[in-house]
Every structure is written in C-alpha cells, then in structure tokens.
C-alpha cells in the first residue's frame, strides 16, 4: 500500500510546479507504484481474484491517462514512459 511518505516522494519527483498534485505525470506515477505493489502482492496471494480485478481497473486508468498525455504532448509522454520504465 502507498504510505504517505512514499506518496509525497513520488509527487515531488514528478511534479511540474510547486503545488502540483494532479498533473497526468503525477497521477501516472502514483498508479504505477500501486500496480507494482499489487503485482508483488499477487506473487504471494495467487488466488486473490478480487484484488486482481482492482489491478486491471488501475491499469486501465493509467492507460487512459497515458493516451491523454500522448494526444496532448508527445514529449511529456515519452519522458514519463522513460522515467517509469513502462513498456508501450
């Protein structure tokens, strides 16, 4: 689960300006961290299908944000993909 300190750290590394918490880059980074956490969770709890559905929803949400960012600004899209190591 994302602890407050970890969440603040992610926001500070990906923010565009001082009070930025909702830019697509920040949202994508937070969702990516949750996806990584849940992926590790499923290595131990293979039969947790309820949470697996939540993971699929999070992946879909991140995909929509990435598509939006790609449509609006390709350079920002490429930089966030490279920073987070997301395959596309």
Swiss-Prot record:
Question: Has the keyword RNA-binding been applied to this entry?
Answer: yes
Can you say what this protein is called? Answer: Small ribosomal subunit protein uS15
Q: Which organism is it from?
A: Geobacter sulfurreducens (strain ATCC 51573 / DSM 12127 / PCA)
Q: What does this protein do?
A: One of the primary rRNA binding proteins, it binds directly to 16S rRNA where it helps nucleate assembly of the platform of the 30S subunit by binding and bridging several RNA helices of the 16S rRNA.
Q: Name one GO biological process term.
A: translation
Q: Which SMART domains match?
A: Ribosomal_S15
Which family does the UniProt entry place this protein in? Answer: Belongs to the universal ribosomal protein uS15 family.
The alphabetized UniProt keywords are: Ribonucleoprotein, Ribosomal protein, RNA-binding, rRNA-binding
């Amino acid at each position: 689960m994302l602890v407050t300190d970890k969440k603040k750290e992610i926001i500070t590394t990906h923010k565009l300006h001082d009070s930025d918490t909702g830019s697509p880059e920040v949202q994508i980074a937070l969702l990516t961290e949750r996806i990584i956490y849940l992926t590790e969770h499923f290595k131990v709890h293979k039969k947790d299908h309820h949470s697996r559905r939540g993971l699929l929803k999070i992946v879909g949400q991140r995909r929509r944000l990435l598509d939006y960012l790609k449509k609006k600004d390709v350079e920002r899209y490429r930089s966030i993909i490279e920073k987070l190591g997301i395959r596309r």
